[in-house]
């Protein structure tokens, strides 16, 4: 019984052992994944950075925008590159784009710098004694003058000279607010709130195209979708270093000299259902607007201080006709066609059947009229003739063919960007003024009202210049390039070898993101090229910025833009050094693919390697593990620190770290050299002692024997020599030769040393051969023993498996028999129910 019980216990142990072995084999079959660092991967994140500008300005042109652009911008790239990103979808939001804010600040800087060297009109903030201007009625009836002018006389501050000048009624206000109609005392409109600066007499403010560029380490993504509305995902994306040339045209209601839609008209709004939000319309065909100030007049120069002059319209005793009368003309057919398309588009978006365009409901002159700069004068044109029509799906009422003439007023004192405390006095321009522009967009607002109504009223808007820049920057966004990526691989770092080579330079910067739409496996193949393009782009941009900064330093006009360029230059180098510092901390300096000892945690991402490397892009992968990137970085750093400690302890053992180096050729040469030195030293000592011995004997009167004299060899203690009475063995004595002379002694010693070395070396070789023979024999026996043991255990495993299968089969059979027996009994019981009922009834009847 005990034997059977032990046998059963052994069988159970074998069963559990086989199960554990299977579990271990299953666990070992799962491949371990390790974190691998990649440098040069196409990954970016949304960012805010300092942009710099590029332009084709000419320093010899005295126009204000040219002067500003010469000082503030770098030259444009003669061969701009735009690289399409395949399989990339990116979200854009034109209403929350920091590029708009930066451009707004930059254009303010443009105007401020243009006005900086000009005269401040603080001495002109005095009382003006004004009367109505006497005009000659020579008008042709087509254009009516809407605003009167005042002929004013005043004394310049700190002077007694009385000056006469004409001012537009819009530029002056009566001092006595209670009696505005009959008042004769006036002041300039902005004297009590703003500092008025007179524009330089030769400034015309003619805008030139300005490109806004991202510094090195950053890129600008561009949406190339022709129907993109400014917000949401865009699947047709490219990367550029600079935007297209944007003309900083200051205007309201109508957008001038911008870009056109390539297909149909595009309506853009942050929230079209919110009537407070501005509606930006991008036309698909431009409409020419020609503005003219048809009358000439003269201007006078009044000295108001040391090297300071005020330019005004001559007022005293000079009849100049309708001075300042201006107008703009637009093709009625082109405007009618564009407005009809806008109405149709708005009707579809707002779900309205009738769209009515009406003039502005009121506000500042910049909002109620179309404001633009024409030849240096600021025109304020009445657009009520443009926005006065109704459009529906069946019929429309509006303009006929012909020309629409917009009456315009001219203001000399203009609020700059609606900023408190900033105003500009535009000096009068002599001669005729003509300018031609292209209407490429509209700024509109809607009245709102009942949502269930089928009617909607649209009015012109504007005033916030950010909307002007937004109409051009809607398709751009700035991103920060993150060239370091981590991903799981099967490779694990074994030994850290410190690399001293640096990553090379070459190619161009934009090619770095060219592989953004490729899978991770395809993109990782070109890491070296992409890393070189990253550094090359930094160097290329730094050279351009440095040239611009050097030019500013030469002109001694290093402005805010110069500081921005310095910031961009330093920022790019700092970002590159930061990435290199991270790679150095992780032990990955100079490497594009760097394995680590950090195991990949499936909680970060449980995707398979094939799914990661064959189906995902680097951007998709980065979004998936973005929450764990900081943790992975810290684990890599801790692993590298521990590895450096281990490496230090290993290096302290010095040459024991690698025993194989003992058998290198350099080591063998060193061994031979050491052997020769030892042999030479022994021979030298032998010679020295022999000479000293001979000299000592000669001094004692001893004469050396000849070379043929044989001396008896001392016998051992077991071989006694001949004694006095009984003779021993003498016939087999050996003798040694006593040499005489330095060279003979040297030869004898060298011969004996060689013989000694030969015998010892032979003995050593024989011993080594014997050891190798024994080791081989023992090793062979050990291999045979292991083979037999392996066969034995394999047989045992087979027997155990067979026994386990037999046991399982027997147990299954027994349980199956029991189940069958139970089923049979149940069936019999069911079948016997009628019989039992019958028997019971029979007993009851008996």
From Swiss-Prot:
Any one Gene Ontology molecular-function term assigned to this protein's record: structural molecule activity
Region span, V4: 381-408
Positions of region (V2): 152-191
S-palmitoyl cysteine: lipidated positions: 754, 827
Key words of the record: AIDS, Apoptosis, Clathrin-mediated endocytosis of virus by host, Cleavage on pair of basic residues, Coiled coil, Disulfide bond, Fusion of virus membrane with host endosomal membrane, Fusion of virus membrane with host membrane, Glycoprotein, Host cell membrane, Host endosome, Host membrane, Host-virus interaction, Lipoprotein, Membrane, Palmitate, Signal, Transmembrane, Transmembrane helix, Viral attachment to host cell, Viral envelope protein, Viral immunoevasion, Viral penetration into host cytoplasm, Virion, Virus endocytosis by host, Virus entry into host cell
Coiled coil: 623-657
Keyword Signal: yes
Region (V3): 291-327
Residue ranges of the region described as MPER: 652-673
Start and end residues of each stretch annotated as CD4-binding loop: 360-370
V5: annotated segments: 450-461, 453-461
Residues carrying sugar: 87, 129, 151, 179, 182, 229, 236, 257, 271, 284, 290, 351, 382, 388, 392, 395, 401, 438, 451-452, 601, 606, 615, 627
Membrane-crossing segments per the record: 675-695
First and last residue of the signal peptide: 1-31
Extracellular side: 32-674
Residues under site feature: Cleavage: 501-502
InterPro entries: Gp120_core_sf, Gp160, GP41-like, HIV1_Gp120
Family affiliation: Belongs to the HIV-1 env protein family.
Protein name stated in the entry: Envelope glycoprotein gp160
Organism: Human immunodeficiency virus type 1 group M subtype D (isolate NDK)
Gene that this sequence comes from: env
């Amino acid at each position: 019984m005990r034997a059977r019980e032990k046998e059963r216990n052994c069988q159970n142990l074998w069963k559990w052992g086989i199960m554990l072995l299977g579990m271990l084999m299953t666990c070992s079959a799962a491949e371990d994944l390790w974190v691998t660092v990649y440098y040069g991967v196409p990954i970016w994140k949304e960012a805010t950075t300092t942009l710099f500008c590029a332009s084709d300005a000419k320093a010899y042109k005295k126009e204000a925008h040219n002067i500003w652009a010469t000082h503030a911008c770098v030259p444009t790239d003669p061969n701009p590159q735009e690289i399409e990103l395949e399989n990339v979808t990116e979200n854009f939001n034109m209403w929350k784009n920091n590029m708009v804010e930066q451009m707004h600040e930059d254009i303010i800087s443009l105007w401020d710098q243009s006005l900086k060297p000009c005269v401040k009109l603080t001495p002109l903030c005095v009382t003006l004694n004004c009367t109505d201007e006497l005009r000659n009625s020579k008008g042709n009836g087509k254009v009516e003058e809407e605003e009167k002018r005042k002929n004013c006389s005043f004394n310049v501050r700190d002077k007694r000279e009385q000056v006469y000048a004409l001012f537009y009624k819009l530029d002056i206000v009566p001092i006595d607010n209670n009696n505005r109609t009959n008042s004769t005392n006036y002041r300039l409109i902005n004297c009590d709130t703003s500092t008025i600066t007179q524009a330089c007499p030769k400034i015309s403010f003619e805008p030139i195209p300005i490109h806004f560029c991202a510094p090195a380490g950053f890129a600008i993504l561009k949406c190339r979708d022709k129907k993109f509305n400014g917000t949401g995902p865009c699947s047709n994306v490219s990367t550029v270093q600079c935007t297209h040339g944007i003309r900083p045209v200051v205007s309201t209601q109508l957008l001038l000299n911008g870009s056109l839609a390539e297909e149909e008209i595009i309506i853009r709004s942050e929230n079209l259902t919110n009537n407070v939000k501005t509606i930006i319309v991008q036309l698909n065909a431009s409409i020419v607007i020609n503005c003219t100030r048809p009358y000439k007049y003269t201007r006078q120069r009044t000295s108001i201080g040391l090297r300071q002059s005020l330019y005004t319209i001559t007022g005293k005793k000079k009849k100049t006709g309708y001075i300042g009368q201006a107008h703009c003309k637009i093709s009625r057919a082109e405007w009618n066609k564009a407005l009809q398309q806008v109405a149709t588009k708005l009707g579809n978006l707002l779900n309205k059947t009738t769209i009515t365009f009406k003039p502005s409901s009121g506000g500042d002159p910049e909002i109620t009229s179309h404001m633009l700069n024409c030849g240096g004068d600021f025109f304020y044109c009445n657009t009520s003739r443009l926005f006065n029509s109704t459009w529906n799906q069946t019929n429309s009422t509006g303009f006929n063919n012909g020309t629409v003439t917009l009456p315009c007023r001219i203001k000399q004192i203009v609020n700059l960007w609606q900023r408190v405390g900033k105003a500009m006095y535009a000096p009068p321009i002599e001669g005729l003024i003509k300018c031609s522009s292209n209407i490429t967009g509209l700024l509109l607002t809607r009245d709102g009202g009942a949502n269930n109504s089928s009617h909607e009223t649209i009015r012109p808007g504007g005033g916030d210049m950010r909307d002007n820049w937004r109409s051009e920057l809607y398709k751009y966004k700035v991103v920060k390039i993150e060239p370091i990526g981590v991903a799981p691989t099967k490779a694990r770092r074994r030994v850290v070898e410190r690399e001293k080579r640096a990553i090379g330079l070459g190619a161009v910067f934009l090619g770095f993101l060219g592989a953004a739409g490729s899978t991770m496996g395809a993109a990782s193949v070109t890491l070296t090229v992409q890393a070189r393009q990253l550094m090359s782009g930094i160097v290329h941009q730094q050279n351009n910025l440095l040239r611009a900064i050097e030019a500013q330093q030469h002109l001694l006009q290093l402005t805010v833009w110069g500081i921005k360029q310095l910031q961009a230059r330093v920022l790019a180098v700092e970002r590159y050094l930061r990435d290199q510092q991270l790679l150095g901390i992780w032990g990955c300096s100079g490497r594009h693919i760097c394995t680590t000892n950090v195991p990949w945690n499936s909680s970060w991402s449980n995707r398979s390697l094939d799914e990661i490397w064959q189906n995902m892009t680097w951007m998709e992968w980065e979004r998936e593990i973005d929450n764990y990137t900081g943790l992975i970085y810290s684990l890599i750093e801790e692993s590298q620190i521990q590895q450096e400690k281990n490496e230090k302890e290993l290096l302290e053992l010095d040459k024991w770290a690698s025993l194989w180096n003992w058998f290198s050729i350099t080591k063998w040469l060193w061994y031979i050299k050491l052997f020769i030195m030892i042999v030479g030293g022994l021979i030298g000592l032998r010679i020295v002692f022999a000479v000293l011995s001979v000299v000592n004997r000669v001094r004692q009167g001893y004469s050396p024997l000849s070379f043929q004299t044989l001396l008896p060899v001392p016998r051992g203690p077991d071989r006694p020599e001949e004694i006095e009475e009984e003779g021993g063995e003498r016939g087999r004595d050996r003798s040694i030769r006593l040499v005489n002379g330095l060279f003979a002694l040297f030869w004898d010693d060298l011969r004996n040393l060689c013989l000694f070395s030969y015998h010892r070396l032979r003995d050593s070789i024989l011993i080594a051969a014997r050891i190798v023979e024994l080791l081989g024999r023992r090793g062979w026996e050990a291999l045979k023993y292991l083979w037999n043991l392996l066969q034995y255990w394999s047989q045992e495993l087979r027997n155990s498996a067979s026994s386990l299968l037999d046991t399982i089969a027997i147990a299954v059979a027994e349980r199956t028999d029991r189940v069958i027996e139970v089923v049979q009994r149940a069936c019999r019981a069911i079948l016997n129910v009628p019989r039992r009922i019958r028997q019971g009834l029979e007993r009851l009847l008996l």
